Amino acid sequence: MDIATNFITRSLSEIAPNASQSSLHVTPSSVSNNAFGLKLRQLISDTYCPHIFIMASDDTENFMKRKGFDDFASFIRPFGDRIFQSSTNNSAISKETLDSRIFDNDHDSIRFVPMEAVQVPRQWKRNKAWNTENGLENCANSRFAPGGDIDSFRVLSQKLIEEWVQSGSNNYPENGFLNPILDYLKLLLSGNPVAEHETFSHPVGCLIVITSHNTNPMATVMRLFKEINNAPFPNFISKEILHYYLFIHDEDNNDLSNSKQIFQQMRRSLGANSHFIRLRSNYISAKPLDTDRYDTSSIQSLKNAPRDSMESESFCSSSDDAKPITFVTKNLRKFPIPEWRSSLEVQAESEQSCLPLYPLLPVEEVEGMKKFVQTMLYDSIYPFMQRCVRAWEEDLTPQYGNLTTRLLFASKKYWSRNHSSHSQGNYDPLSLIYSSEKQESIKRKMADFSFMLRDYKRAYEIYDEIRNTFSQDKAWNYLASCEEIQIICLLMQNRNISLKSQISYLNKWFDEMVYIYAVRLHSFYYTFRSVLVTSLLLSLKPAFSIDFAASWLAKILEPGPISLNPFETSFLNTTIAGMYSNKEHVGVTDGNRRRKAAFWFAYSAGFWRDCGHCKMAEICWNLANRVYSKSGWESLSEHMLDLKPTLSENFRVKNTFH
């Protein structure tokens, strides 16, 4: 016990002076160029991206069913995960967006979701239960399910770590736990739930889709347009969105010249936000799968089979009048599985009686869809968002302009409140929202648009302007969300920042954010998400900012804010070790960094053992012992050797029994 106490005291005593010193000497560049930092920044950019709702005609949905998909939203969804810009798209991107890109493989993302996606996880569960009771569940691809469901996340996160442990050997690298941290964070952030206090999951645009099978295309388009305007969205979601139109030509059953003529008529009426694409309606499957019911082994064989091993004569149409289809094997690709599936969706899919089958697609269709999504994003979505930001800035200048205009507005607001006892501001304390047409809601949307456009500096300034308004109105959910994204904005900026001047503000915003999310709103998801994201981003900054990041993450490990289960406690302790194990961290001496990583690995080993993950406990012990066995501290080395037998499964079972 004395050795352990001495060990902890000595390790923590090294952190304290370094943390205090960091607020005085932080001048290097704040840009993190190591592999973990690049992946984390890309992950954050992919999380907070524009959402596009799908409104497809009946003929489109029938076309997709013949092609092997549940609906058009399921078909287009994975093509929005990774969108790479071409040289012709640069003119549509602002200088701030280009400056925020820090590596060659940087990409953008958009989320394609069905119209019914505007619902919270609780509502989605109720609808799913009702469908199950009424026999409406089927074996088709899982529909979109929102994120934020903690129960399903906890189940899948444990499976994620177990798979990582089983996939490796005992010789894990020092920074080997960084990849599981990213996978865990991606699972947490997938399916960003619809919320009133942030507009990232609110629709930026809507894609209206019809096919060449439609007998009255213009009338159908106008009907779908009216349905969008009359959709029962919550009043905190604005319907001022971009409308984009897609015409699908059936390559197998319709005349191309006739389809092009119809599309040109549509384009003259609807404008430039229209696109024409050619797709085949035949569902391409392999003979072993051409049965009435697809079994799991056949599905897995298709998913895992190398493309070169498939012969062209094994493919046929799945329609009733099945005919051989001539395809060259090298011109076929597996349909990409969506990367950003929420834990609720993954769990629902695993509970189905049969797994979804992702068909094969001709390479021309895959490339055509990629080109369409790229054109839509860079030529329409981004320019639309930029125009919105400029228009909102002009409209809101009287309230959020220079110092003089803001003082005049503040005095007017003060006197109007004094002379009107019924004035309650724009915030509704009963429904806890600002309606979409209110200035505060527009300002928040303007900041979120700037963030999604990667103009982090401007977004930070806007969040800073509206934070005081949320505080005065006691709009706690808006205030906490504003502080969360404001911290992320500051840490995502591709420029030098001085932690000497910023750390006091960061700590204040962080503490208030955690208090509101955990105590006032009792939201485990938002508390956990905000702490994990901001801590990991802060750990990338130079010098000893990593010590502040560790202290942030350690705050939710203390009893009080939120109730963590044993697995989450073990994971977060190991995450702190993983942050210190980042070899390419700037400004921290290698020996100091490795000792702190070893301390947290050793500290978390016991937690892993107690929650039944003895293999993880052994991995953490090995990573810590690599450092301590060479430390020259004989008593500590002996303590580590004495600790190893206590991490075994037999010791845990015996200790539990007693």
UniProtKB/Swiss-Prot annotation:
Keywords for this entry? ER-Golgi transport, Golgi apparatus, Meiosis, Transport
Per the UniProt record, one Pfam family is TRAPPC-Trs85
Annotated Gene Ontology cellular component terms: cell division site; cytosol; nucleus; TRAPPIII protein complex
Location(s), subcellular: Golgi apparatus, cis-Golgi network
Q: Which GO terms describe its biological process?
A: intracellular protein transport; macroautophagy; meiotic cell cycle; vesicle-mediated transport
Q: Which domain of life is it from?
A: Eukaryota
Q: What is its main location?
A: Golgi
Role summary: Component of the TRAPP I and TRAPP II complexes. TRAPP I plays a key role in the late stages of endoplasmic reticulum to Golgi traffic. TRAPP II seems to play a role in intra-Golgi transport. Has a role late in meiosis following DNA replication.
Q: Which family does it belong to?
A: Belongs to the TRS85 family.
Q: How does it assemble?
A: Part of the multisubunit TRAPP (transport protein particle) complexes I and II.
Name of the protein described by the UniProt record? Transport protein particle subunit trs85-1
